[in-house]
From Swiss-Prot:
One MF term in the entry's GO annotations: NADP binding
Protein name as catalogued: Gamma-glutamyl phosphate reductase
Record PANTHER family: DELTA-1-PYRROLINE-5-CARBOXYLATE SYNTHASE, GLUTAMATE SEMIALDEHYDE DEHYDROGENASE
BP terms from Gene Ontology: L-proline biosynthetic process
Length: 456
């Protein structure tokens, strides 16, 4: 495939089949060779900054026309836009993945079943990962790098709005990895290819969608392949009665304003009634100065109307606001009677993504953190910390709000599964069955697989 868009003669089915074949070889590629390939990807991206920017500028120009037509938001275009510094950050991200410990071949458990009968639980790649993402061309590189490091083949389907950017970045990856099994990374571009991908449950082991809540929901509803992702990021910050209000103002500002377009930005601010007047007088001025639109419940509106030092205008919040991921400089505010009410509100309207309590009372914080149902729950910290890099996981492929396999920011570990290796010496099950069955030891011990004899 060329940058200019020459049609790839392979069908989506053929590409997935090739990826399935490549996955078997890729799982046995040494750590050193995978890391060398990742370093080569970073170098190739840096050498092609002008080529990448040219393609991205064309994508952005088309997207800006869609903003004018009311089809896209400016936040959507912001996610699409690349810059020299952002491309440099992408290259550094790839290098950071290369520098991480190998997630493969780790012995999670070693258990002696009997003399010379030892069981090992060892990490292995998942296999073939299909990913469908919107607007962010950097996601293509991020997902490819993490897939390569974890020994997985990957099928990449980006949005048409980033077609040129995705194509150039994909070609950079292929140019950098001639020593990696052919077919390990595949780019599909046609809209109808998405449905093909979702139907190939015999070849694709995991689907990772990244995009709007409706988009992710569509993927979940139209495949029998396991889906790792989240439909939306309706994150809350609760300002408790025992909060340090100066801290609370700073954290709530960061959680909304630092980068409002991402899924870990706060969308709803809950405020205990005892501190609401004093807190809102500080908070609303800061939000106004940052251009944040405020939508408040009746109690919030009443405080604004009665407090002489609050001059900001607010919009009446509707029921829909409590379940909306704005992805923009908009925040909804509700005043609550108690900590329990805050917890109940979050568990009713939240998306199980990231929630935060601001309080100086550790007992109240513990109650909140135990009771709130979310992948990440914070105490006195911005919701924006819900990120694989900030968690020390390296780059992430996304955030999962599910509870099976992986939860929260998903890095390399989330792209592996495990295999059981049993090392024996001719043992038979009959020995351990019947009236005179030999008992198992089931004793865990410290040893890694593979086990090497002294003579090699």
């Amino acid at each position: 495939m060329t940058d200019s868009g020459e049609i790839d003669p392979q069908t989506a089915e053929e590409k997935v089949t090739d990826a399935q074949t490549a996955a078997l070889s890729l799982s046995n590629l040494s750590t050193a060779r995978r890391n060398e390939a990742l370093t080569a990807i970073a170098d190739t991206i840096e050498r092609n900054v002008d080529r990448i920017l040219e393609a991205n500028a064309a994508d952005v120009a088309d997207a800006e026309k869609q903003v004018d037509a009311g089809e896209y938001t400016q936040a959507f275009v912001d996610r699409l836009t690349l810059s020299t510094s952002k491309i440099e950050s992408i290259a550094e991200m790839v290098r950071s993945v290369a520098e991480q410990d190998d997630p493969l071949g780790e012995t999670l458990t070693a258990r002696e079943l009997d003399d010379d009968l030892n069981l090992y639980k060892v990490t292995v790649p998942i296999g073939v990962i299909g990913t469908v993402f919107e607007s962010r061309p950097d996601a293509l590189v991020q997902i490819s790098a993490l897939s390569l490091k974890s020994g997985n083949a990957v099928i990449l389907k980006g949005g048409s709005e980033a077609e040129r950017s995705n194509r150039v970045l994909y070609n950079c990856i292929l140019e950098a990895t001639p020593e990696v099994p052919s077919g390990w990374a595949q780019l599909i571009e046609a809209r109808e290819d998405v449905q093909t991908l979702l139907e190939m449950d015999d070849a694709v082991d995991l689907i990772m969608p990244r995009g709007s809540s409706s988009f992710v929901q569509y993927v979940q509803d139209n495949t029998s392949i396991p889906v790792l992702g989240h439909t939306e990021g309706v994150c809350h910050v609760y300002v408790d009665s025992e909060a340090d209000l100066e801290m609370a103002t700073a954290v709530a500002y960061d959680a909304k304003v630092q980068y409002p377009a991402v899924c870990n930005a706060v969308e709803t601010l809950l405020v205990h009634e005892s501190v609401a007047p004093s807190f809102l007088s500080q908070m609303m001025k800061q939000y106004r100065d940052a251009g944040v639109e405020i939508r408040g419940d009746e109690r919030t509106q009443s405080i604004v109307d009665t407090e002489s030092n609050i001059s900001e205008e607010i919009i009446a919040a509707t029921e829909a606001d409590w379940t909306t991921e704005y992805g923009d400089r908009i925040v909804s505010i509700a005043v609550v009677d108690s900590l329990t009410d805050a917890i109940d509100h979050i568990n009713m309207y939240g998306s199980k993504h990231t929630e935060s309590i601001l309080t100086q009372d550790d007992n109240r914080a513990e109650q909140f953190m135990r009771a709130v149902d979310a992948a990440s729950v914070f105490h006195n910290a911005s919701t924006r910390f819900a990120d694989g890099f900030r968690f020390g996981l390296g780059a992430e492929v996304g955030i999962s709000t599910g509870k099976i396999h992986a939860r929260g920011p998903v890095g390399l570990d989330g792209l592996t599964t495990y295999k059981y290796h049993l090392e024996g010496d001719g043992q038979q099950v009959a020995t351990y069955a019947g009236s005179d069955a030999k008992p198992f030891d089931h004793a865990e011990f410290d040893e890694t697989w593979p086990v090497r004899n002294d003579d090699g």
